[in-house]
From Swiss-Prot:
Organism: Teredinibacter turnerae (strain ATCC 39867 / T7901)
Protein name: Elongation factor Tu
Catalytic activity entry: GTP + H2O = GDP + phosphate + H(+)
Domain of life from the UniProt record: Bacteria
Similarity field: Belongs to the TRAFAC class translation factor GTPase superfamily. Classic translation factor GTPase family. EF-Tu/EF-1A subfamily.
Location of region: G2: 60-64
Role: GTP hydrolase that promotes the GTP-dependent binding of aminoacyl-tRNA to the A-site of ribosomes during protein biosynthesis.
Disulfide cysteine pairs (residue numbers): none
Amino acid sequence: MAKEKFERSKPHVNVGTIGHVDHGKTTLTAALTRVCSEVWGGAAVAFDGIDNAPEEKERGITIATSHVEYDSPTRHYAHVDCPGHADYVKNMITGAAQMDGAILVCGATDGPMPQTREHILLSRQVGVPYIVVFLNKADLLAEDCGGVGTDEYNEMLELVEMELRELLDTYEFPGDDTPIIPGSALMALNGEDDNELGTSAVRKLVETLDEYIPEPERAIDQPFLMPIEDVFSISGRGTVVTGRVERGIVKVGEEIEIVGINATTKTTCTGVEMFRKLLDEGRAGENVGVLLRGTKRDEVERGQVLAKPGTITPHTVFQSEVYVLSKDEGGRHTPFFKGYRPQFYFRTTDVTGACELPEGVEMVMPGDNIQMTVTLIAPIAMEEGLRFAIREGGRTVGAGVVAKIIE
């Protein structure tokens, strides 16, 4: 059977379901594919097809994730759902599935639970920019309160909503402005719609995603950045650095900065080549060589980045969210303690750093996730949301993300 051609006509947006165990994340994921396929076309995916998620490896870490897709009238959504809490932690920290927005599923009968809080915190730490709330199991709440629209039902909904908005505020999301949609994922999955809690609520959710989550900026439209992988000296022409353009475009004749490890310097791009052909620009996703005017071979090194001037700065101290690989994943067999000094691998290079653990935490076990403050021995070009690996002698023992830059 021939593969279907991928439609590039609609903007592509990455979302995912987060929330406490058994609040209905997977049911909602299945309901979204069903409702969208019936209303706007596409394929429905059954609950079982999402629930037994295949395991995949991201940087040596085993993560079970389900990927589904669905369409709204204006967009194509790629949606991730994870079976277990540990999978969410790993997924969000490694950036295996980066989200432009998250759908927080919270049971109306239970209200916010420990993982509800933890997933909101993780979203803040790893830089998920927007959250939309689906208040699930509203049909069960209605049964308990003598029906939809009764005073008791409205009061209970309002209470849970208030709790959720406060929780979102705590983690610096705009609680008051966050859309909260009550409904029943199970009803929608079964094609029912009593009191508009089923298919109507899920349709409303998709319309809300369309309105509330802005279209992500494409890599090519962002400011130029290229991690340096190699440096060559070409007699008579000067210094060439090679790497894969991470974002943006570099044009011949433009001024660029060399950032990281040493003091930031400015230079000019005097040539771009790819496969030994000269080009007038290098674009996001391309592996190129960039010729630098007046830069000596020993003034640039692997681990630095080329960037549009003023768009990225070098830092040494940052707060991070880290997942420590378990023994089974090839990680450490023993815990580590404060004063731990591994290598932090950013983009193309390792830099040694010292770890400061949160107050009251004495040790970190393999398989844990933890917030820690890192002080590097050399500055690295970084911004919040940058991913890194933690290594000991070339072996990966953890994965992390820059949550907040300190200096």
